[in-house]
């Protein structure tokens, strides 16, 4: 009985460890998006300071290409919208993973108690024999 519970406990621990890896990966992805959001907000602020007489370039591969100011502002705005939506998606994913992780912790605690009871019962049975 104790061996069966131990195997089940080991499987649940592996699930928990995978959830923790996924959680860490999602947090890392969200942090990268936050950095991109900050960077793009700075670009948006800089573009707001320009007027029609200024020349704007964008980097395409190794080449700088002239770009209309309005087009540059629109591109940055769309990028900000996309990044914001991705951050919301990551936050939702993080909430789900945290909820699953908490449930997994509870499952592990229950299995650990079962295992300890089984070990105690086994020790009691072998002590009587």
Swiss-Prot record:
> Which residues get modified to N6-acetyllysine?
21, 66
| Disulfide-bond pairs as recorded | none
User: What would be one Pfam family of this protein?
Assistant: Prefoldin_2
Q: Which residues form the Glycyl lysine isopeptide (Lys-Gly) (interchain with G-Cter in SUMO2) crosslink? A: 66
Q: Please, one GO biological process term?
A: protein folding
Please provide, in alphabetical order, the Gene Ontology terms of the cellular component aspect for this entry. cytoplasm; prefoldin complex
* Gene3D superfamilies membership: 1.10.287.370
- N-acetylalanine modification, residue list: 2
Query: Which InterPro entries has this protein been placed in?
Result: PFD_beta-like, Prefoldin
Source organism superkingdom: Eukaryota
State where the record puts the cross-link Glycyl lysine isopeptide (Lys-Gly) (interchain with G-Cter in SUMO1). Answer: 66
What GO MF annotations does this protein's record show?
A: protein-folding chaperone binding; unfolded protein binding
Which terms are listed as keywords in the entry? Acetylation, Chaperone, Isopeptide bond, Ubl conjugation
Family indicated by similarity: Belongs to the prefoldin subunit beta family.
Subunit architecture: Heterohexamer of two PFD-alpha type and four PFD-beta type subunits. Component of the PAQosome complex which is responsible for the biogenesis of several protein complexes and which consists of R2TP complex members RUVBL1, RUVBL2, RPAP3 and PIH1D1, URI complex members PFDN2, PFDN6, PDRG1, UXT and URI1 as well as ASDURF, POLR2E and DNAAF10/WDR92.
Q: What does this protein do?
A: Binds specifically to cytosolic chaperonin (c-CPN) and transfers target proteins to it. Binds to nascent polypeptide chain and promotes folding in an environment in which there are many competing pathways for nonnative proteins.
Which named protein is this? Answer: Prefoldin subunit 6
Q: Which organism is it from?
A: Canis lupus familiaris (Dog)
Originating gene = PFDN6
């Amino acid at each position: 009985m104790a061996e069966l519970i131990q195997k089940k406990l080991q499987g649940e621990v592996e699930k928990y460890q995978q959830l923790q890896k996924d959680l860490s990966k999602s947090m890392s992805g969200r942090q990268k998006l936050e950095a991109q959001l900050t960077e793009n907000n700075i670009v948006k602020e800089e573009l707001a300071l320009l007027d029609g007489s200024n020349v704007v370039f964008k980097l395409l591969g190794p080449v700088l290409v002239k770009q209309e100011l309005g087009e540059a502002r629109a591109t940055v705005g769309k990028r900000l919208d996309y990044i914001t939506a991705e951050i919301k998606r990551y936050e939702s994913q993080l909430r789900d993973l945290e909820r699953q992780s908490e449930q997994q912790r509870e499952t592990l605690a229950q299995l650990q108690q079962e295992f300890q009871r089984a070990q105690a019962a086994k020790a009691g049975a072998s002590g009587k024999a």
